[in-house]
């Protein structure tokens, strides 16, 4: 199982009526170029490693979106016994920005997103989360 203790815990924004799914870990993953990417991983209630998951949903948000927008979607997949992982793209949500203006989602090249995606796949998903891996994306 993935060791979350080696990473800085990251916050989620909730309201009284819009709560994060339970049984999750949200943290900042440090990329090779020293940027923080906010990542969330949720496990179905009662999950036991290698026994009670149907696989992993890799949920990839659209442009200018963030983890919190997908709480209901995450919960639907958890109810169906999938593990769910998602992250805020570089420059979005609570991930690091490439420029000083926190209100702008600028990246120099889309390759930066590709690199972040590949790091998360290689260092978190492939070695630690249940197969099969099912990718779901929106608007990128």
Region roles according to the model:
Residues 128-139:
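Alpha/beta-hydrolase fold nucleophile elbow
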Residues 1-30, 37-45, 49:
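An N-terminal hydrophobic leader/cap segment in hydrolases
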Residues 54-65, 140:
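Active-site glycine-rich loops that stabilize anionic/oxyanionic intermediates
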Residues 54-55, 81-82, 130-132:
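Short coil/turn segments at beta-strand junctions that form active-site/ligand-binding loops
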Residues 105-127:
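Alpha/beta-hydrolase active-site loop
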């Amino acid at each position: 199982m993935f060791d979350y203790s080696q990473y800085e815990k990251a916050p989620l924004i909730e309201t009284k009526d819009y709560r994060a799914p339970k049984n999750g870990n949200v943290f900042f993953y440090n990329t090779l170029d020293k940027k923080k990417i906010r990542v969330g991983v949720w496990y179905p209630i009662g999950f036991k490693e290698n026994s009670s998951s149907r696989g992993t949903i890799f949920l990839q948000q659209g442009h200018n979106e963030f983890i919190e927008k997908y709480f209901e979607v995450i919960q639907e997949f958890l109810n169906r016994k999938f593990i769910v992982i998602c992250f805020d793209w570089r420059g979005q949500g609570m991930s690091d920005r490439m420029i000083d203006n926190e209100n702008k989602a600028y990246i120099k090249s889309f390759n930066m997103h590709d690199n972040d995606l590949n790091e998360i796949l290689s260092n978190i998903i492939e070695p630690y989360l249940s197969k099969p891996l099912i990718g779901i994306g929106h608007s990128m």
